[in-house]
C-alpha cells in the first residue's frame, strides 16, 4: 500500500464549507491524502457573500504551523487566504523552517465581484516575497490580472453589446 501524502493547508475558515480550509480539507481527503491545517482567519459567510472576517494573529498562525509539523512532516503545502502583510511574512518565516519544495498558492486576493480582499501592501508582499517560494499558483482571472500574469481583454460571455 502506498504511503499517504500529508498536506498542510494554510487558509481561512469558511463557515459555509464551500471554500477555504473546509473545502481544501475535503479535497485532500477525497484524493486519499492526510490534511493538516493552520487557520489564518475565521469568516462568517454563505453562498451569497461574506458577512465578517476575524483575522488570526500572525504568531498564532506560526504556532499552528509549527506544532502541526513537529510530528507529521508535510509532503506539500497549500496556501489560501493570507489577509495581511504581517500574516504573509509570518507564513514565509514558517515555510523557511519547514524546507518544503511543493508549495501551492491560491492567492485569495480578489472577490468574484472584483473587490480586493487584501490591501495593496499585502499584494505587494505576496508578489515580491511569497510567489518566489511557490511551486504552483492557482489564481482566478482577476487575481492573475492583479499579479500581472494575465491581461484579460475579451468581452465576457454576458457582454451582448
Predicted regions and their residues:
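Small-residue (G/A/S/T)-rich helix-start motifs and N-terminal tracts that mark the onset
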Residues: 1-76, 132, 148, 154
Amino acid at each position: 500500500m502506498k504511503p499517504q501524502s500529508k498536506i498542510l493547508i494554510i487558509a481561512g475558515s469558511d463557515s459555509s464549507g464551500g471554500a477555504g480550509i473546509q473545502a481544501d480539507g475535503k479535497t485532500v481527503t477525497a484524493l486519499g491524502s492526510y490534511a493538516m491545517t493552520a487557520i489564518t482567519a475565521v469568516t462568517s459567510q454563505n453562498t451569497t457573500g461574506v458577512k465578517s472576517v476575524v483575522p488570526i494573529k500572525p504568531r498564532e498562525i506560526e504556532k499552528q504551523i509549527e506544532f502541526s509539523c513537529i510530528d507529521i512532516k508535510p509532503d506539500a503545502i497549500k496556501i489560501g487566504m493570507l489577509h495581511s502583510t504581517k500574516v504573509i511574512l509570518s507564513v514565509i518565516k514558517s515555510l523557511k523552517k519547514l524546507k518544503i519544495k511543493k508549495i501551492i498558492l491560491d492567492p485569495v486576493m480578489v472577490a468574484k465581484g472584483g473587490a480586493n480582499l487584501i490591501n495593496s501592501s499585502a499584494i505587494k508582499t505576496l508578489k515580491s516575497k511569497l510567489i518566489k517560494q511557490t511551486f504552483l499558483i492557482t489564481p482566478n482571472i482577476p487575481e492573475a490580472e492583479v499579479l500581472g500574469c494575465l491581461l484579460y481583454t475579451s468581452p465576457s460571455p454576458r457582454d451582448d453589446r
